[in-house]
């Protein structure tokens, strides 16, 4: 039986939203065990007694890592926090994967320092799946903040892992890999990006060249590789812009005159389709590529729905033996 360790105390809607998602997923994933780490009393109040069985368990912890906690200090000082105890279960082989909605930096630290890097991987990278305009498939972008500074060889390894993820988990044959840069020409960018371009071009990947920021959501690449600083800034920009556009549309239509409101009714289906395009819940969470088990971060404001999809994502990563394949591939290099 596959086992997912879940930090039940992380995120704005914890633990209620997490428990709801687990109970829903539990009924659809009979070969998967869910271990919830957190305040025993709170969790017991939310979980019906008849649901606690071989497929669902609670591991009592007494501490929680807050968003404002300094990541590395937090995982060292809060040994009995839900996140750290869950990470240690994965490290000790008592669970196969770790999921959290909590402090991103602390989760990255748990992945790197507790669960550990795969031999041969220089630096793990954080990778979400983001929307595109012409498809429901979206695209992967890595790194979005696990590393403040990057080297060309890091970008190559992230591209290799992300390409394999796109094939195994997203079902994309021969994924198109692009390098985020400030121009399409091969000589664009600083020294890191120019050298990364050459490494990607000379690899066995389906490298399609540089991609600029204004092309990211057009669906011209299945995987976009970038340094962590730029990737994090771009991710926040995409999230913020999407939210603002949808809010402005809604506000304009609901607060307009009678003709505007009548027009809104006529295009209701199209607006729902637009909202669906920018709905990232169906993609699951951001994956920390390059550590010894699946470690996945879901947005801290998530409700039941994105958590449910993330549980399905994590389960598939375990089932497809993604990390084992990474280990076989990179330990030989």
Curated annotation (Swiss-Prot):
Matching InterPro entries: FA_synthesis (IPR003664), Phospholipid_synth_PlsX-like (IPR012281)
Enzyme Commission code(s) on record: 2.3.1.274
Pathway: Lipid metabolism; phospholipid metabolism
Quaternary organization: Homodimer. Probably interacts with PlsY.
Keywords: Cytoplasm, Lipid biosynthesis, Lipid metabolism, Phospholipid biosynthesis, Phospholipid metabolism, Transferase
Function, in words: Catalyzes the reversible formation of acyl-phosphate (acyl-PO(4)) from acyl-[acyl-carrier-protein] (acyl-ACP). This enzyme utilizes acyl-ACP as fatty acyl donor, but not acyl-CoA.
Cytoplasm is among the record's keywords: yes
EC top class named in words: transferase
Superkingdom as given in the UniProt entry: Bacteria
Organism, scientific name: Lactobacillus acidophilus (strain ATCC 700396 / NCK56 / N2 / NCFM)
Gene Ontology terms for molecular function: phosphate:acyl-[acyl carrier protein] acyltransferase activity
CC per GO annotation: cytoplasm
Localization, UniProt: Cytoplasm
Catalyzed chemical reaction(s): a fatty acyl-[ACP] + phosphate = an acyl phosphate + holo-[ACP]
Family per similarity comment: Belongs to the PlsX family.
Protein name (database record): Phosphate acyltransferase
């Amino acid at each position: 039986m596959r086992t997912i360790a879940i930090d039940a105390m992380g995120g704005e809607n914890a633990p209620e939203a997490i428990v709801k998602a687990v109970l829903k997923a539990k009924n659809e994933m009979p070969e998967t065990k869910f271990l919830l780490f957190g305040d025993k009393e709170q969790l017991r109040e939310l979980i019906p007694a008849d649901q606690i069985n071989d497929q669902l368990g609670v591991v009592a912890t007494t501490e929680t890592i807050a968003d404002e906690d300094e990541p590395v200090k937090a995982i060292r000082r809060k040994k009995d926090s839900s996140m750290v105890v869950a990470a240690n279960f994965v490290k000790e082989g008592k669970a196969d994967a770790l999921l959290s909605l909590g402090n991103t930096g602390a989760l990255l630290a748990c992945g790197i320092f507790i669960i550990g890097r795969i031999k041969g991987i220089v630096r793990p990278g954080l990778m979400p799946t983001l929307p595109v305009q012409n498809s429901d498939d979206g695209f992967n972008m890595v790194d979005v903040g696990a590393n403040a500074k990057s080297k060309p060889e890091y970008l190559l390894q992230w591209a290799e892992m992300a390409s394999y993820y796109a094939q195994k988990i997203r079902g994309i044959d021969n994924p198109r890999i692009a390098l985020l840069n400030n121009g399409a020409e091969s000589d664009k960018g600083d020294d890191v990006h120019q050298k990364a371009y050459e490494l990607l071009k000379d690899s066995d990947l389906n490298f399609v060249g540089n991609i600029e920021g204004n092309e990211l959501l057009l669906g011209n690449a299945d995987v976009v590789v970038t340094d962590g600083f730029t990737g994090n800034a771009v991710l926040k920009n995409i999230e913020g812009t999407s939210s603002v556009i949808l809010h402005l549309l809604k506000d304009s239509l609901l607060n307009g005159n009678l003709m505007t409101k009548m027009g809104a009714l006529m295009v209701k289906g199209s607006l729902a389709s637009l909202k669906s395009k920018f709905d990232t819940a169906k993609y699951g969470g951001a994956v920390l590529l390059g550590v010894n088990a699946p470690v996945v971060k879901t947005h801290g404001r998530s409700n039941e729905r994105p958590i449910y999809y993330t549980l399905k994502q994590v389960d598939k990563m375990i089932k497809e033996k993604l990390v084992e394949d990474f280990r076989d591939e990179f330990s030989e290099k």
